[in-house]
Every structure is written in structure tokens, then in C-alpha cells.
Design a protein with these regions (language model features):
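Acidic, proline/glycine-rich low-complexity IDRs
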Residues: 1-31, 108-176
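Long, contiguous N-terminal structural blocks used for assembly/anchoring
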Residues: 1-106
């Protein structure tokens, strides 16, 4: 078993609430409940694919160009994502995670670099509002340190704007 498979298996056992909707899967490419859902083969943090969710009945040209940019240039913003998550994790660790005394699950981020985040998260969805500006999307992750709520990132112009619970990655607003 690979390290990623071991993490996935452990994460399912530890945080089953994050998988409630897993069996309520949409077709690989289709429309359901006013959302267009398909699989986007994007590799971020050692995950081969994420679910792409667009809150619209069709994919606009801006959606297409944003998706193409993500696929082609993901390496250019992975460090920004990693640093944003690392800063958020450091905040949580200083706030309350250090009280758990479990160095495997909640390693001390002090004197470590942001690469430790790679072992603690796995992307699960890329989310886009119906009408967007180019480069505006959210990424949602399973994570060991935000087990009950998941982890979310709001991206603007392909830069991290906000990191928090999973709702941050899903509560995107359409531009008018």
C-alpha cells in the first residue's frame, strides 16, 4: 500500500463525516441540482484527480480558461497554497492543537517548513461559482487537523485569498 492509500484508509476511519455524500455521486459529467459536476484530472498534493463542481448549468468560457490555467500552471501556485495552509495550521496549532499531545497527527510546525502539510491534506474538490472572474475558485481538502469540517481555500487571481474550514472553499459568490 502506498503512503497515500494508507492516509486515505486512516482518514476514512477517523473522519467518516467527511464522506457522507461520497455515495451520492454525480455522473462523471452531468447536471444535477443546478450544478455541473465532472472529474478534473488535476494532480495537487499527490492526488490524481479532484471533483470539479460548477454552480451553473453550463461551463462558460471563463470557467474553461480558469480550468485550463489550473491544469497547465498548477505548479506555479502550489507553493502559495501550501504556505496558506501552513500558516492556517500554525494558527490552529498555537490556538488549541498543541494541547492534544499527538505529534504524529498534529506535528509541531515550529522550525519546520510548509512541506509537512503535504502529509496532512488531500484535495477533494475544486469549486467554481456560476459567474466568475478568471482565477476565482475554491479548493476543498480532507485534512487531519480539520477533521470534522474539512479544509477550504478561496483563490482569487490564482492566489490564496482565504483559508479556513471547508465552507471557505464552497461559499463562493457569483460576480454580477
Amino acid at each position: 500500500m502506498s503512503t497515500q492509500e494508507i492516509f486515505d484508509e486512516w482518514h476514512r476511519r477517523e473522519y467518516p463525516s467527511q464522506y457522507i455524500w461520497e455515495n451520492y455521486t454525480y455522473p462523471n459529467f452531468g447536471i444535477s441540482d443546478d450544478q455541473l459536476v465532472c472529474r478534473l484530472p488535476i494532480r495537487i498534493f499527490n492526488c490524481d484527480n479532484c471533483q470539479l463542481i460548477i454552480d451553473n448549468e453550463e461551463i462558460s468560457e471563463i470557467h474553461k480558461s480558469t480550468i485550463e490555467y489550473i491544469v497547465r500552471n498548477q505548479e506555479s501556485f502550489i507553493e502559495d497554497i501550501r504556505k496558506g495552509i501552513f500558516d492556517y495550521y500554525t494558527f490552529l496549532w498555537n490556538d488549541y492543537l498543541n494541547e492534544f499531545e499527538d505529534d504524529n497527527k498534529y506535528p509541531n510546525p515550529m522550525n519546520k517548513d510548509a512541506q509537512i502539510i503535504d502529509l496532512m491534506i488531500k484535495p477533494k474538490a475544486i469549486h467554481m461559482a456560476g459567474k466568475i472572474d478568471e482565477g476565482y475558485f475554491g479548493i476543498c481538502f480532507n485534512s487531519t487537523f480539520e477533521g470534522d469540517h474539512g479544509l477550504g481555500i478561496e483563490m482569487r487571481n490564482y492566489k490564496v485569498k482565504n483559508v479556513g474550514a471547508e465552507s471557505v472553499g464552497f461559499n463562493l459568490h457569483s460576480v454580477e
